[in-house]
Amino acid sequence: PKFAVAAAVQLPNVSDIEFESSLTELRELAKTLGYTVVNTFVQKRASFDTTAYLGVGKREEIRCYVNNDSGSDEFEEIVIESDGHDISALLVDHEISPSQARNLENEVGCEVMDRTMVILEIFHRNARSRAARAQVEIARLGYMAPRLREAAKLAGPQGRQRSGTGGRGAGESHTELDRRKIRDRIAELQQEIITMEAERK
């Protein structure tokens, strides 16, 4: 079995019942992907941390748990008890930005999947018909597109540009090429779905 931990921030406008219900649902979704959620980390905050979704102390707590680490002196009150489980993923009960996911991943030391990614992965695994698979792929590509935009910003003005090689136009970066491929693939899939619907009639 694969082991995961879940994490969520409770905002002031979310009731305890709503919050726990959403987390319970995430744990059930995780089971569908073959994960056993062995611990859940929650935090009440006025807003999400813009850098990495969770606050610094909570991120350190998760890092210690995932890595079986006793923690730094600053966070010496943290109790580490991961029961020997090898944690392969942190499941976040919200949709978070690519930079938040990456920062969280770097800090806690395991893969980070937000709620949207978990749901899309379930759809992908369960899609049986050609039309269903095409629709799921469109959804996944749509999820990836803004993440590529953010990656391009982080890559800086160069964006690893090289002119006119490997199918790229002059000065087109890898990221721009990826985004163009995504747009082309979405258009292709949408056309496939239209064709399949016409064939059924």
Residue ranges and their predicted role:
Residues P1-A7, V14-S15, A151, A155-K201:
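Conserved G1/Walker A P-loop phosphate-binding module
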Residues P1-F3, A7-P12, C64, R133-R149, ...:
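Contiguous effector/interaction surfaces
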Residues P1-R115, I119:
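N-terminal accessory targeting/assembly segments
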Residues D16-F19, A52-V56, H94-E95, A127, ...:
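Conserved phosphate/pyrophosphate-binding and hydrolysis machinery centered on Walker-type P-loop NTPases
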Residues E25, E105, E137, E172, ...:
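Acidic-residue sensor for enzyme active/binding pockets
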Residues L29-T36, I62-S72, N103, E107-E111, ...:
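Conserved, well-folded catalytic cores of nucleic-acid-processing
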Residues L90, L141, I182:
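Conserved hydrophobic/aromatic pocket- or pore-lining residues that grip, position, or stack substrates
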Residues M117-V136:
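Short alpha-helix plus adjacent loop in nuclease-associated cores
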